[in-house]
């Protein structure tokens, strides 16, 4: 069994309790034993970031960008190694892991290039002897708290713009996937990033995370995770002595609407890919299917035909879906399945544990799910799809919007009027037309509405860079 103990020992230097990083496809496979960070360890990491800020912020932006570009090249060269580690640590298929690694090294290159064009603007003055211009400057030390489901790309899409802008960082990945960020820090170091610019800490969010975001040395917090934790972080930041910028990317309960004008074969493909790809463990995953009554029966048949071909197993094999990430999430998924059975939803596919050494679960589909059921309203974060019938487009839009979340939403249709109506009325930060609800491009801004985000600062694209910069206005007279 492959061990990553050397990687852990080199980059994760906590002094707290021991944590076992386990392969979710094989519970007997320990990837590494990791020492979690204590509050004192976190304070030390923050102090290192503070001490390094002046040097790094004064490093010319093109030089900072060159380091990111180099890191992207190195990651590309080591892509296979990154992908294997991701599959072993998080559980996703090698194909999905390689896709994420590719996006990650392209993100490094994207923000490396953007560092060359950080600039302010010049404005006209009413006084002929005055020049007005603005200057963009880094914020200071930023705290980045990242989830386990995209254990490389989300850390990169936070860290790369933060570094390009000239900030130093304390980054806390999820305890389920710390090795991916350790590998990222290693690549940045090889690319020439000075020690202390990025400081990795690993530990429980209730202790380590709270310590980071509450520290008055932290100028900004970027968090991706559950809405519950996001709201708590929002309050912690608000109670600090220092005003702190905050960026939140939170939970989702995304719907795909199948219109009566839809290509039903395409719709079934998008539903299965969006609902069961990545084991349903994505904030943009399809969790709800809203089906126009005129095509309900035909679509259901296509859906069941497609899901029967969906292959589940270890991500290192030729499969479509890997294991659930760990025992806690596995139990949560099973609890929702039992709930669905008990409240009157009809289980039409799956719902069973797949025997083996990992946390394997069949893709699961319920129909007859009503808007008052928890299956309809709550984020599950697993391979569980709920199906609800809508009498027309108006009711479908009402159902899509009838949750507290607004990350992504999709429509499958050929009727342009229906498409435009859906796009204009649905409350979500990303709308997909004849595309799966999952899948984002790095050059486009991303962020959810309602309880899926703070709707203040977007991630990815050029927008993300602005979160990590402040603007100074200068009036220069003579």
Curated annotation (Swiss-Prot):
Single biological process term from Gene Ontology: arabinose catabolic process
Active-site feature positions: 249 (proton acceptor), 283 (nucleophile)
PANTHER family: ALDEHYDE DEHYDROGENASE-RELATED (PTHR11699)
Catalytic activity: 2,5-dioxopentanoate + NADP(+) + H2O = 2-oxoglutarate + NADPH + 2 H(+)
Record InterPro entries: Ald_DH/histidinol_DH, Ald_DH_C, Ald_DH_CS_CYS, Ald_DH_CS_GLU, Ald_DH_N, Aldehyde_DH_dom
pH dependence: Optimum pH is 7.8.
Organism: Saccharolobus solfataricus (strain ATCC 35092 / DSM 1617 / JCM 11322 / P2) (Sulfolobus solfataricus)
Induction per the UniProt record: Expression is highly induced during growth on D-arabinose. The promoter contains the conserved cis-regulatory element 5'-AACATGTT-3' ARA-box found in arabinose-induced genes.
GO molecular function: 2,5-dioxovalerate dehydrogenase (NADP+) activity
Gene3D superfamilies per UniProt: Aldehyde Dehydrogenase, Chain A, domain 1 (3.40.605.10), Aldehyde Dehydrogenase, Chain A, domain 2 (3.40.309.10)
PROSITE patterns listed in its UniProt record: ALDEHYDE_DEHYDR_CYS (PS00070), ALDEHYDE_DEHYDR_GLU (PS00687)
Keyword NADP: yes
Pfam family, one: Aldedh
The protein's name: 2,5-dioxopentanoate dehydrogenase
Ligand binding (NADP(+)): 148-149, 172-175, 225-226, 379
